[in-house]
Amino acid sequence: MEWFFVGRFESMGFGYDEYVNEDDTKCRQIWDDGYEEIFEIS
């Protein structure tokens, strides 16, 4: 699955990079501490 970079989001010195997949059905967040979350876009 290919991911496309959406943007960088930060709040109070902590943040994540956000990506969407090629058919816009999933969103992926990669946090500064290495935590990764993938969820469905409704």
Predicted regions and their residues:
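Acidic, low-complexity, intrinsically disordered interaction modules
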Residues: 1-42
